[in-house]
Amino acid sequence: IYSNVEAIAESQYVFIQGNALKERIQKIEKTDEKRFVIGECGFGFGLNFLLACECFIRFASPGSTLYYIAGELHPVLKRDLQRFIRLLPDTILSLANELLDTYPENGKTLHRITFNVSKCTIQLDLLYGDAASTFSSICQQKYQVDAWIMDGFSPDKNETMWNKKLCDSVAALSKPGTTFATYTSAGLVRRNLEEVGFHVTKSSGYGKKRHMLTGNFRQTPTISKKSTWSFPWDSTSQASAEKHRKICIIGAGITGCATAHALARRGFAVDLIEKDAEIASGTSGNPRSLVHLNPAQQLNSTMRFRFNAYLYALRQYNSLSKIANFNWQPDGIIQPACSEKEQDAITTLWQRQLYAEAHVSSVNAKRISDLAGYISNYSGFYFPGAGSLDPVALCQAWARHKNIRLFTSHEVLDFQRKDNQWCVKIRGNEEEITAQYDSLILCNNMDVSSFSSLPDYPLAYNHGQTDTYEIPENFKIPTKPLCNKGYLIPWMTAKKRMLTIGGCYAQGIHKLNSSKQLTQRNISLLEKLSPTLHKNITGAQLESISRIGTRLTTKDYQPLIGPVEDTLACKHLYSDLQRNARKTVQANPVYSPGLYINVGHGSNGLTTAPLAGEYLASIINDETLPLAQDEIVVVHPLRYLIRRLKKQEA
């Protein structure tokens, strides 16, 4: 770690002054959006970020937002960041400690971290991976960077960072007037930046460095954002409208409450409509649920979305639990193997080194026993930051915001677009009313198919059940949750030890009248996880409190999150795919204005809903998105129409 005093002085001179951040931030209050976007190549220890935040907090008008996007190929370890922060001055120490608390260990995905300071909001998007590739992955979004901090080693030590691909991505994320600053004055850097449309000026460098480069972007016809698009149909750039201040969300379960909270934090007025008498009355109302990750053999787009969502959920729950009580217990979760075959698969997966040990670690049978007081015959995975919580209390915490109005025992009968607003017919208190909203978000998983105006999404229903036992004092139970095919969660009320088990399900939309069969299936799953505990519970004939619920999922088991397409218009736009499935059609989709959907999370709602809500709020608020482009493809509602067109089924 280098000298902090010199590093701070150099950063202030080269990047803060080089981009004239103080003067430009002071002018934000004269704009309608009150936002400023900074991009950085090379996050390092976060010093440039902290100094930019300090400048923003000092000089931005109240209510302003700083969006900071940074790429980093080699993230520093958390312990090294901790050592670095100890040496920082008091002026940035508070924010630095908050960064340390939320700092994600290496994981090649996009990590969104939000800092709430006294008068403004700071939003950090950390993109782990090669800067050229990671910035390219977000070029299709509505990023328009105001200032670039081009840090990193000099080109002779890190030539790959300064290549033409990176400069193309930087240009695609810039707009006329975007500035940059870098301490290097190398000819390679200057030529590449000039070639993509920047006017470059050589200035006096800091200290012993004779020169540095600054400049501004002058958009030219040779720079086209479309040149970087791999999936043009998934663009969300047309999804946000000019006016989105009053929003209706249908469904007050986990996804609805998470989405409402994300929007309310941004100042939107949200009406949260729930047809049942209580919030989180469906499967969101289980007494106890897990927040966990299912590791896969490869980090493809689907798994990167899941991993991104998992880490984001942990950060949000850790932060929210400081001001709200939903019995969040991030004590870790163990996934033990239940056979030699499973143990071999876990060993093979671990050898791929896809996950940092801070997120997932391989543990042998003895270590499992030490961690959870549970005798295992096999090794397994340990998820240090995962845990369990009370879903109902969580939904209540999300909905308890001054910008959210909750209406229970109110049912949405229909909605239609009229005079640039959504007219929503609502029945409640023995009367029907029609309310007008700028935007409408469907989070009512079980009833979403009742709206005939929606596209024909391939939805599927699964019935599941949890069984909760009061555990006698003489019973020994694991001290941490266990999960495999099924799961068990030890937890406490004020005076009682409880154990919730689950994992069984039955497919179909039919109603289940009896839970006895599912209770036996849960007991069978428990036998695989903990034979001793299974024997004790069945031997003592403990009675369980059973709770049946129905979850909504989709044909490809990925949620539907995003703007709802205009089916007829999109069929016409992408009709060429019926003749050539591999053709790239350069056309933005047409959406139903202000209509969004967020359903189909299945049993992963607690893990994926926070990021899903953040993603929708970012679209509606016309800001940087917390998903990379290939992750958006995974959850975009339009994906099904595109697939049908390619298969000539539409």
Provide a role label for each language-model segment.
Residues 429-524, 530-546:
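Flavin-dependent oxidoreductases
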Residues 244-272:
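N-terminal Rossmann-like FAD-binding beta1-loop-alpha1 element of flavoenzymes
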Residues 381-429, 433-435, 439, 443-444, ...:
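Helical element adjacent to the flavin cofactor pocket in flavoenzyme catalytic cores
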Residues 537-650:
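C-terminal catalytic lobe of FAD-dependent flavoproteins
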Residues 92, 297-300, 324-335, 362-401, ...:
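Helix-loop-beta segment of a Rossmann-like dinucleotide-binding subdomain
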Residues 265-285:
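Glycine-rich FAD pyrophosphate-binding loop
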Residues 28-144, 164:
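The AdoMet/dcAdoMet-binding core of the Class I SAM-like
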Residues 288-371:
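Dinucleotide-binding Rossmann-like beta1-alpha1 core, especially the glycine-rich loop
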